[in-house]
Structures are given as structure tokens and as C-alpha cells.
Amino acid sequence: MLKEENWAIKKKNPFKRRSNTNLTTRIKNCKKIIGNKKYIKVGFYEDIIKSNRTINLINFFYKKKKSEIYFLMGADNLVNFHKWHKWKTISQKCNIIVFDRHGYKKKSLNSTTYRRLNKKNLKFIEFNKVNISSSQLRKI
């Protein structure tokens, strides 16, 4: 049972030219989504850890919490995960939970990342999907 979830908001996806919404709006929208679930903490950590690298955020949480880390991503991100800074180290330090995204299952299962990852640290979650991107979700 998870005791706490940390939803780390980034200024922007490094693989996209720009973000459709500003940071303050995204944080506000995320807090609205979680409602009164006190175990979910929404935060912007880049200023605290002085980095926008995922591996540095994971190291920060690991040192702070000394607990098992589950890293959640969409199947669309798994396709390009091998391009992330220190992606192999991230996969060694975390259990990676991948949520299927419409149109990405086959691509993600055939990706360089999927072929190279240790499958015991990787769980692929399928669920009733809605064909909507995270950018579209934020506009709701």
C-alpha cells in the first residue's frame, strides 16, 4: 500500500518546444484533479533540487524518504525513454509503471527501452483508455 504519492510537475517536457500552460496553472489544475486526497503531494521540485533531470529528482526522493520508488509514465514516454538522461539508472532505482496510451502499446513494446529494461522492475498497466493527451487533459 502506498503511503504517499508525489506528483512532480515539470516546467516543460524537454522533448517539446513549449508548454501549452504555465507552471502555476498546471500545479493548480493538478491539485484540482486530486481533490482532498491528502496522500498525494503535488509539487514543483526543480528549484529545490537545482535540476530538471528526472534522475536528480529520484535521488532527492530516495535520500529523503528511504523508500521504494514507483515511477509512473505513459506508454508514449516509454517509446523515447532511452533518450532521457541516465535512463538506465532511473530504471534500476525505480519500479516503472507504464500506463497504456491509445495508439502507443505496440510502439512502446517494440521500443529500444522496452527491449533493454529489466522486466522485473517494469509493469505495463492496461485499462479502459480515453483517447486524450496530457496537454488536452490540462485544458479540461
Predicted regions and their residues:
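Nucleotidyltransferase catalytic core that binds NTPs
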Residues: 1-140
